[in-house]
């Protein structure tokens, strides 16, 4: 009964840029799931979809009302959500209430913005499900996927990196670290993984944990 009830519930899709959002949407259509989109992409790329809504991130009241109006209590995020220009953002009452948290999070990077939105939705009794709930094929199982295998020293470095990563992640919204010989070589800041990698010397041969 629960499974049947879940199947008929409408899924809210918070979609941003990148191919990932399109892959998720394609699968949801293939599975004949009922859905609606809140388009957070830069150039409104889902506008041709009849179920798509373009709502500013500052209009939290409007977003929450739409989710409830659609009789939905589950949403997922897919794709890169463009950081808004806070100076020109139009707010509704809920937006005014929650915006200080989002501005604070934006200083830590994109991942922090999404984590804050998830917290806000939880407060409003809206559950955020995994981005790959309908695309389990996009996740890899535990194991080795390359010819190179980690040695004992690498495994120790990885353990240290994961401990450091988890500790940091509780305080800050760090998405990646690089380790080598039990030393943390670099941590990702709000500029992203690419920028972190570009700061490393070409032959540093570290291990990326993300």
Which functions belong to the PLM regions below?
Residues 1-9:
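N-terminal amphipathic/basic-hydrophobic helices that include classical n-h-c signal peptides
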Residues 39-59:
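N-terminal beta-loop-helix "entrance" segment that forms/cooperates
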Residues 53-67, 107-111:
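Glycine-rich anion/phosphate-binding loops
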Residues 87-107:
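A charged helix-plus-loop insertion that forms the helical arch/lid used to bind
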């Amino acid at each position: 009964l629960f499974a049947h009830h879940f199947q008929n519930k409408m899924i809210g899709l918070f979609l941003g840029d990148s191919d990932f959002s399109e892959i998720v949407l394609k699968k949801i259509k293939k599975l004949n799931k009922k859905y609606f989109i809140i388009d957070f992409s830069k150039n409104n790329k889902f506008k041709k979809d009849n179920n798509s809504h373009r709502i500013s991130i500052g209009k939290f009241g409007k977003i929450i009302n739409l989710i409830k109006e659609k009789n939905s209590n589950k949403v997922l995020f897919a794709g890169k959500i463009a950081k808004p220009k806070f100076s020109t953002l139009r707010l509704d009452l809920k937006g005014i209430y929650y915006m200080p948290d989002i501005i604070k999070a934006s200083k830590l990077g994109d991942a922090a913005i999404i984590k804050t939105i998830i917290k806000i939705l939880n407060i409003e009794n809206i559950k955020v499900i995994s981005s790959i709930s309908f695309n389990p094929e996009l996740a890899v199982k535990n194991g080795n996927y390359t010819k190179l295998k980690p040695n004992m020293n690498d495994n120790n470095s990885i353990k240290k990196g994961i401990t450091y990563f988890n500790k940091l992640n509780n305080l800050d919204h760090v998405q990646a670290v690089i380790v080598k010989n039990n030393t943390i070589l670099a941590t990702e800041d709000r500029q992203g993984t690419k920028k972190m990698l570009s700061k490393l010397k070409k032959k540093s041969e570290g291990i990326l944990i993300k």
